[in-house]
Regions:
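C-terminal functional extensions of proteins
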Residues: 2, 239-348
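Structural beta-sheet core signal
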Residues: 17, 40-41, 226, 263
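Metallocofactor- and cofactor-centric catalytic cores in central/energy metabolism, strongly enriched
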Residues: 8-9, 14-18, 26, 33, ...
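Electropositive, gly/pro-rich neighborhoods at or near active sites that engage anionic ligands
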Residues: 45-164, 321-324, 328, 335-347
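Conserved phosphate- and dinucleotide-binding cores of soluble alpha/beta proteins
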Residues: 2-11, 29-34, 42-59, 179-180, ...
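Active-site gating loop/helix substructures
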Residues: 138-197
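Glycine-rich beta-strand-to-loop/alpha-helix junction loops that act as flexible
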Residues: 18-22, 196-199
Length: 348
């Protein structure tokens, strides 16, 4: 990472980031430094943990991933941020996040879940917007290469380990839920669309299965970037290369959905690699020729760091590289348009 970026965040690029889980919230923490014109479009297929309990008890969409994104973009007082992140240590609320409960309470007050998210956004004075990809009550079903299937995002890991084969396809039940109109609008108007890092089959792809999302991405004139994970994920993507990730994305959407794939070039210490291997994960191999054969350009940059033995995308480095990709594209477009104008003048 180098150079400088002098554009004020108020005038930064319009960025729509699609995903869920830790990967999306990590990305948002970096992007908010460069633009206020930011929209997070978040999956609602989670059915495990505290989110799953609230979903089952209250019949509401799972709040966890959305709450994490709100926390990442919050500009509230430190005590408020600490409160939203607080998890109850024991009793019937053990493991439950106060932020989840707060959003659940707002959902009971407001006429719709997206309005509840909007209200929580105001309380936390967030940068940009956070939107559920849909307000429909959806479940995720995974089908494996041996024909077995399982319903429920939280059950996929266990079932995949039992079946000992790759995931062939995932789908939403019911199929083709309607996307939130504001999410469609954000994608259509974006300068940059980012498929965030995160769990391939349970955080990223579920968004693409919502009716209208893929079409909106295709229609958009934005720069479209997929940020590939640094490590494979036990229970989802063991043995996957970069091209395997892209094939899965295209299989669940359409070929050529994005222009670029951003991968990590930072070295990972051997001791860290060995520790991850014990947990069934490894660095994702960048099979460049196979990726380019799919019509996707590979960009490798040092966007990951190791902290406390964990490999993570660095929010600032990742956001910087995405903003630079946007700037470079704009320069190319300006040069192209300038060349065309000059040619037209010569011809006349």
């Amino acid at each position: 990472m180098g150079g400088c970026y002098s554009v004020a965040p108020e005038h930064g690029p319009r960025i729509a980031a699609v995903g869920g889980g830790t990967g999306l919230s990590t990305l948002l923490r970096g992007l908010k430094l460069y633009t206020k014109n930011l929209t997070a479009i978040v999956t609602v297929a989670d059915d495990g943990g505290g989110s799953g309990r609230l979903r089952q008890d209250l019949g509401m969409p799972p709040p966890g991933d959305i709450r994490s994104c709100l926390e990442a973009l919050a500009n509230a007082e430190p005590l408020m941020a600490q409160l939203m992140h607080y998890r109850f240590p024991e009793g019937t609320l053990a493991g439950q996040s106060f932020g989840n409960l707060f959003l659940a309470a707002l959902n009971g007050i407001m006429p719709s879940f997206d309005r509840a998210v909007e209200s929580m956004s105001q309380v936390l004075a967030i940068t940009g917007r956070v939107l559920p990809v849909t307000t429909a009550d959806v479940q995720l079903e995974a089908t494996f290469e041996n024909g077995a299937s399982v319903v429920g995002e939280s059950h996929i890991f266990r079932c995949k380990k039992e079946q000992d084969c790759r995931i062939r396809r995932v789908r939403l039940i019911p199929e083709h839920p309607r996307a939130l109109p504001a999410a469609i609008e954000a994608l259509e108007q974006a300068d940059v669309i980012v498929l965030a890092p995160g769990s391939l089959y349970t955080s990223i792809i579920p968004n693409l299965l919502v009716d209208g999302i893929v079409d909106a991405i295709r229609r958009s004139r934005a720069l479209k970037v997929y940020v590939c994970n640094v490590m494979t994920q036990d229970g989802e993507t063991e043995g996957y290369t970069v091209s395997d990730h892209i094939r899965a994305l295209f299989k669940h959407s359409c070929p050529g959905l994005f222009d670029l794939c951003l991968t990590n070039s930072s070295p990972i210490p051997p001791a860290v690699v060995q520790r991850y291997a014990l947990e069934g994960a490894e660095p994702i191999f960048c099979d460049r020729e196979a990726v380019e054969a799919l019509g996707v350009e590979i960009i490798s940059r040092p966007v990951a760091t190791v902290e406390n033995g964990l490999v993570r995308h660095n929010p600032g480095h990742l956001a910087w590289e995405l903003v630079q990709l946007h700037n470079q594209r704009n320069i190319r477009l300006v040069c192209r348009d300038s060349h065309r104008t000059t040619c037209n003048r010569v011809e006349t």
